[in-house]
Amino acid sequence: MFVGQYVEERSMKMRIAIGCLLASFAITAAAVAANPQAKLEPKPTFASVLDHQLSSTEKTVVPAAEAMPEDKYNFAPTQGEFKGVRTFAAEVKHMAVANFHLGAAILGEKVPVDTGNGPDGPAALTSKADILKFLNDSFVYAHKALNSINETNILEPVKSPFGPNMTTRLALAMSITGHPYDHYGQMVEYLRMNGIVPPASRK
């Protein structure tokens, strides 16, 4: 579904992703060795490291979605090179759609909600409240998916949700934590064009 909307992770990107996870474990292990009290802390797992990263992403993008007034949710620039770009609402719904599809692929199950017939989510979702619920629910589901990842299944082949190829849970997890930032940048532009400072940029 949505073939062409996403690109499969390449081997170099995979090596970088694995390297980042291993580096995180190494840093934590070094901290524990240097501080005996740290041994009382829970040992990090693949799931906990990935889930922490998703929480960081969520804490950045959700407040941005909340910051736009309802009467501006359908805002999109219409002139010059901006013509045809997604509205603010479509950006938010698109993030949620991706979260649901990536999460379902990690869990090996069908997407649990109606995500519409395209990458921008259900057309029936038009109010700010409904769109925010869709986004928040998608993050709840994404957290569930990441917490199912362990050292046994993290590199097992799984079907990509965006084409016929196979991928891994690690590749999907890196997408689910990083993909929202692709659209957060656009949301920031829309907020600032309407005189709103993004929450993450406020002092």
Feature locations, PLM:
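Acidic/histidine-rich alpha-helical segments that form the ligand environment
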Residues: 122-160, 168-180
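Well-ordered alpha-helical scaffold segments within catalytic/enzyme domains
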Residues: 60, 64-65, 103, 141, ...
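Surface-exposed helix-capping loop/turn segments at secondary-structure junctions
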Residues: 66-75, 146-155, 192-198
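Short, Lys/Arg-enriched N-terminal segments with co-localized hydrophobic residues
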Residues: 1-13
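Acidic/histidine-rich, surface-exposed loop or edge segments in extracytoplasmic proteins
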Residues: 37-46, 109-124
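Boundary at the C-terminal end of the N-terminal hydrophobic targeting segment
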Residues: 29-36
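Short, contiguous alpha-helical
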Residues: 51, 55-62, 74-119, 159-203
